[in-house]
Curated annotation (Swiss-Prot):
Residues that coordinate or bind substrate: 54-57, 73, 118-119, 184-185, 239
Name assigned to this protein: Beta-fructofuranosidase, insoluble isoenzyme CWINV5
Glycosylation sites: 84, 152, 179, 333, 438
PANTHER family associated with the record: BETA-FRUCTOFURANOSIDASE, INSOLUBLE ISOENZYME CWINV1-RELATED
Organism expressing this protein natively: Arabidopsis thaliana
Upper lineage: Eukaryota, Viridiplantae, Streptophyta, Embryophyta, Tracheophyta
Subcellular location: Secreted, Extracellular space, Apoplast; Secreted, Cell wall
Length: 572
């Protein structure tokens, strides 16, 4: 696989094509990461980042002729967001891990996108031809929807794209009552039984968030449906909507156009600008009425489940037809001040792509890092059945602590579960529970201290706490935390502590997997039932001065059934 990747790089370095603005073209593989950036302590080793400058939303991920493509919102000119100069960055990969960064696929050049080429999606048409629908910020600063097509379908790297002469395809107006300043991020289209394509686009009417629905026979002329696909009052703007089917009985992915039926549910995800978080609901798509109805217990607002309870936004999925899986991408922003981002010359990265599927309960989605990430594993350290006494800390030796993959299984005895503290009636917000300073209860917090300094002046704690649901209750409440409060001695960083309830039985082994990559910590609890991502910037715990610990701050003992920690190579 490495030989294939290096051959691809060599090929791109030899290519240098110059075409017009409208035929938007790759010149070659972009410059290598400058040494003054590459050697920075917070520059990640195996997460995707462009060579420099600002990156945000993932756009139009797909697989075409065996090559994975990732487009993304990118400011070529600096490490801050500039919506009026945003282009579609472009990268390709054979394995979702090692990426070749190409020149932008779409740049502002027409009246319909002259003030920025914003987010959108790829749709694979029945003839196998990929097309992109994206939002352009036009010369009047209206948000309009545009189409681009690949110029050369025989090129698996899709280096040349051409804008449609019909652009813009959809424009807000007094007639259609679409808010011209809140109409963006069209989804991947799905094909209905009536022979029409459908897309939904995020919007806002007052405080009502909605997913506007359009249909088309030819992918050029789009007609607005009388009703939105879905809406909810009081939520504000719905950015980056994503709508896709999931199988009810197994983890295989489904094509976005897969028909509804008794063995299929649908997911609607929206990114709320009010909270800067992604929320999803699970429900039914009524193909006759062209509306989405969330299942009982789901509401498309801040009470809905989240993909990730940390720093994760503007996410986008795609169907990997080769491996029959649905893959999730998400933007992870910085937690450092803007001045620091400018100084280091870059900002933003993408989370490790995750396979996503419906939990057997039908009440949540499960996420797990794509299996390809395991190819970067090298030296392994293993523990077997170690007792983690209350109040103890144990170092994990023999692994490159700043760049690692750690999976641990904890076990708590039934006797000790009976000694868990009773959760307070008002403790309904897990983030507040996790934010309690110097917390120590009967059971927990226990877990990992990652990106830690030798004497633990700095560390990020990824941990579990267990409570009894009531004084006489045999039920338990499990909370998963990612605590950044002690992550750095630097004063100016965002050190928010994140938390979420983890819907598992504590009588069973409790799994916790954490991907550590210098300034990002991605954690997966309960085999992916709950996920939390953090950005941290230690001053002491850098390079060889970084340590990894298992700990138990509770009063009751916890068993480490197994711990596997791998040093991780950097991706190309």
């Amino acid at each position: 696989m490495a030989n294939i990747v290096w051959c691809n790089i060599a090929m791109f370095l030899l290519v240098s094509l110059f075409l017009t603005d409208d035929a938007v073209v790759v010149l070659d593989a972009l410059d290598n990461v400058p040494n003054n950036i590459k050697n920075q302590p917070y520059r990640t080793g195996y997460h995707f980042q462009p060579p420099k400058n600002w990156m945000n939303d993932p756009n139009g991920p797909m697989i075409y002729k065996g090559i994975y493509h990732l487009f993304y919102q990118w400011n070529q000119n600096g490490a801050v967001m500039d919506v009026n100069k945003t282009v579609w960055g472009h990268a390709t990969s054979t394995d979702l891990i090692n990426w070749i960064t190409l020149s932008p696929a779409i740049r502002p050049s027409r009246p319909s996108d002259i003030n920025g080429c914003w987010s959108g999606s790829v749709t694979i048409l029945p003839n196998g031809k990929p097309v992109i629908l994206y939002t352009g910020n036009d010369r009047y600063n209206r948000q309009v929807q545009n189409l681009v097509k690949p110029k050369n379908l025989t090129d698996p790297y899709l280096r040349h794209w051409t804008k449609s002469p019909e652009n813009p395809l959809v424009t807000p107006s007094p007639v259609n009552h679409i808010n011209s300043s809140a109409f963006r991020d069209p989804t991947t289209a799905w094909f209905g039984r009536d022979g029409r394509w459908r897309i939904t686009t995020g919007s806002q009417e007052g405080r009502r968030g909605l997913a506007i629905l359009h249909t088309s026979k030819d992918f050029v002329i789009w007609k607005q449906s009388p009703k939105p696909l879905h809406y909810h009052d009081g939520t504000g703007m719905w950015e980056c909507p994503d709508f896709f089917p999931v199988a009810r009985t197994d983890s295989r992915g489904l094509d976005t156009s897969f028909s509804s039926g008794p063995m299929v549910k649908h997911v609607l995800k929206v990114s709320l600008t009010d909270t800067f978080n992604d929320y999803y609901t699970i429900g039914t798509y009524d193909e006759v009425r062209d509306v989405y109805v969330p299942d009982k217990g789901f509401v498309q607002d801040e009470t809905a489940p989240r993909y990730d309870y940390g720093k994760f936004y503007a996410s986008k999925t795609f169907y990997d037809s080769v491996n029959q899986r649905r893959i999730l991408w998400g933007w992870v922003n910085e937690s450092s001040p803007e001045k620091d981002n400018i100084k280091k010359g870059w900002a933003g990265l993408q989370a490790i792509p995750r396979k996503v599927w419906l939990d057997e309960s039908g009440k949540r989605l499960v996420q797990w890092p794509v299996k390809e990430i395991e190819r970067l594993r090298t030296t392994q350290v293993k523990w077997g059945n170690k007792l983690l006494k209350g109040g103890s800390v144990m170092e994990v030796h023999g692994v490159t602590a700043p760049q690692a993959d750690v999976e641990v299984f904890f076990k708590v005895s039934g006797f000790d579960l009976e000694k868990a503290d009773v959760i307070e009636p008002g403790w309904t917000d897990p983030q507040l529970i996790c934010s309690q300073r110097n917390a120590s209860s009967g059971l927990g917090p226990f877990g990992l201290m990652v990106l830690a300094s030798k004497n633990m002046e700095e560390y990020t704690s990824v941990n579990i706490r267990i409570f009894r649901a009531g004084e006489n209750s045999k039920e338990h409440v499990v909370v998963m935390c990612s605590d950044q409060s002690t992550s750095s001695l630097e004063k100016g960083n965002d050190k928010t502590t994140y938390g979420a309830f983890l819907d598992i039985s504590p009588y069973q082994p409790i799994s916790l997997r954490t991907l550590i990559d210098k300034s990002i910590v991605e954690s997966f609890g309960g085999k992916g039932k709950t996920c939390i991502t953090s950005r941290v910037y230690p001053k002491l715990a850098i390079g060889e001065r970084t340590h990894l610990f298992a700990f138990n701050k509770g009063s009751q003992n916890v068993n480490v059934l197994s711990l596997s920690a791998w040093s991780m190579k950097s991706s190309l």
